[in-house]
Structure formats: structure tokens, C-alpha cells
């Protein structure tokens, strides 16, 4: 596949061309990582359209991070009960199933993972031999980004798999 990339001439020191041609390998598998944010629909749609245009398989993944964090311990109610954990995973699977239905393709594969967001996304991508990871990214204020970090940023720093980031909000 040949991809033309628009660039400013000062971005590429060794070319005066407006477009640079790059050779890429065929993209066969696309992993779309989703959370419960309302912007997940946009991320799923953009990732799916991209995968469809390349004739690639689509995998949707949702990560349930640190189940204890979902507990109501701040209300002194203790950790989650097993039933609640199962319900949380079931709700996550239903979320992915609804997304799959919305995209209208039964061949989309879904998976709910438990653990650290970034680690699970990378592990899943490696297990499935994914060619590109699609994620959303909230555009936070710089201080929030420094303090809170970003899952997409962590994934980007820890993987060599190409990523496609869908901006989901404008900067404040």
C-alpha cells in the first residue's frame, strides 16, 4: 500500500516536496480500545470506518481496571462482592455487543479484559497480532495531563504497534 503524507517542507529536512510517499505493509487487524465515555461511539465509528476501508478485521476491547477501584470503599461499604464483579464484566460485554450491533458487522470480535488499561491493551494487541491500535484521547489541560497522565500516551510509550488516536474533545 502506498500512503501519501502531507507535510511542511521544514518537517522533513531532506525533501522540498509537499507530499512524501511512504510504503506501508497491509493492515489486516485493527484493535479499537473503548471505555464508557460518551465519545466511545465516535472512536468506534472512526476506527471501524478505517478498518473497513482497508479490508481489515476489527477487534473491540474494553478494560475493567482494578476492580477494587469500582468498590464503594469511600462509603465504607467494603470491596466488591463476586456477583458485582461478574455483573461489571457482563455490563462491559453488553456495552461491546451494543457497539458491535451499532457498527452492523457480526464478524467484529469483542473482548473484556481485567487489569491496568494500558497493559491490557498492549497485551491484547500482541496476542492478536494487531497491526494498528485505535484509541480516543481527551484533550486535557496541560496540568491535568502532567498530573493524571493519559492511557493513550502510556500505550504509545510502551508499544511499537502503530496507533491512530481519535481526538474526542477540544482543548479548553
Regions of interest found by a model, annotated:
Residues 3-6, 14-25, 100-133, 170-172:
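Structural beta-alpha unit
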Residues 59-61, 109-113, 164:
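General small-molecule cofactor/ligand-binding pocket signal
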Amino acid at each position: 500500500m502506498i500512503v501519501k503524507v502531507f507535510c511542511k517542507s521544514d518537517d522533513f529536512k531532506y525533501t522540498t516536496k509537499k507530499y512524501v510517499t511512504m510504503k506501508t505493509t497491509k493492515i489486516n487487524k485493527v484493535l479499537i480500545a473503548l471505555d464508557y465515555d460518551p465519545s466511545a461511539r465516535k472512536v468506534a465509528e472512526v476506527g471501524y470506518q478505517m478498518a473497513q476501508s482497508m479490508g481489515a478485521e476489527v477487534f473491540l476491547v474494553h478494560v475493567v481496571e482494578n476492580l477494587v477501584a469500582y468498590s464503594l470503599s469511600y462509603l465504607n461499604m467494603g470491596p466488591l462482592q463476586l456477583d458485582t464483579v461478574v455483573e461489571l464484566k457482563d455490563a462491559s460485554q453488553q456495552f461491546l455487543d451494543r457497539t458491535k450491533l451499532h457498527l452492523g458487522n457480526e464478524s467484529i470480535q469483542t473482548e473484556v479484559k481485567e487489569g491496568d488499561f494500558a497493559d491490557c491493551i498492549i497485551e491484547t494487541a500482541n496476542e492478536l497480532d494487531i497491526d494498528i491500535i485505535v484509541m480516543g484521547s481527551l484533550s486535557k489541560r496541560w496540568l491535568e495531563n502532567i498530573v493524571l497522565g493519559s492511557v493513550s500516551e502510556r500505550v504509545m510509550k510502551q508499544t511499537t504497534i502503530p496507533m491512530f488516536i481519535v481526538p474526542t474533545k477540544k482543548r479548553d
